[in-house]
A protein has these predicted regions:
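Peripheral interaction segments used for macromolecular assembly
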Residues: 1-90
């Protein structure tokens, strides 16, 4: 339940690495049971949606911090997790 609450808290927050904004969390992807977040749908500055795995993100006040932009996975991975999980906003 704590993980789910942390996932919900990340909605609409900026995703940043070393002070650089990479995008914004637009949805939380939950596991198949809808109980735990597995990652985030991030709308990036280039207009593309990418998948950010939940364990790689740190909620820090008003933003989500990641160690590297390489942690944002391509659309294919986002589609996989959407298909095998549940979007919070669905």
């Amino acid at each position: 339940m704590v993980a789910l609450m942390r996932g919900v808290e990340a909605l609409n927050k900026r995703v940043m690495t070393s002070g650089i904004e990479l995008g914004r969390v637009v949805d939380v992807i939950l596991d198949e049971a809808g109980e735990r977040p597995v990652g985030f749908d991030v709308l990036c500055g280039d207009g593309s949606h990418r998948f950010l795995p939940f364990p790689t993100a740190r909620l820090e006040g008003e933003h989500v911090e990641v160690d590297s932009s390489l942690l944002l996975l391509e659309r294919e991975q986002l589609d996989f997790y959407r298909k095998h999980g549940r979007p919070l906003r669905a």
